[in-house]
């Protein structure tokens, strides 16, 4: 283990900094998951006596469910350290399970290690609000569901979007989910391809329905007030948004997902 702790050649993947960053934000109800077994000794050296769980090696989908479902039921937030995915989880079953069953808030890279953060919250399986919003000619948003209506600064806003491919989708698109203040200024956002990049739009088949979950991290200094949540789509590698039509009428380049109330922290 000497090399892991003291040889600069091993410092590219800075587990000390990862552990420090997690410790700075950890709160009761958080846990850390390691997706590669050889992460255990070096990470727990810097992060001892905490809730840390090694993921099963080469899991199948049932094994991923057996491992993750109890953790998602016990903890509110999960930190995932992804390293050597091609060897430890080549089919990405851990990441796929979490895309279906949690709300990812973002990634951060430390050398070759990727730290991802997920919020565990109720999982709507059908829209709470139905929509008939068409993005371009090939994609329809059938509706959305929010978990909760009032949030405090620092909370995660869980959003589920329900997409449908009307026909073959020729290109890859990203989704942006944005929280706007009363002046229309951006307050928080999450941008990624559907399913956290696992369900690329150019793989959708006509009639396919995609349940797509997003965790929007609210800034710690977000002022209290009412905010509007919106969703849009844009081409990967570009910035121009797809046009939106609702009830056969042009509706700009985004769709409103309703309002969210931010209240002072207790």
Question: What are these model-predicted stretches?
Answer:
Residues 1-10:
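Transmembrane alpha-helical segments
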Residues 12, 16-41, 45-266:
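C-terminal luminal/periplasmic domains and tails of membrane-associated envelope-modifying transferases
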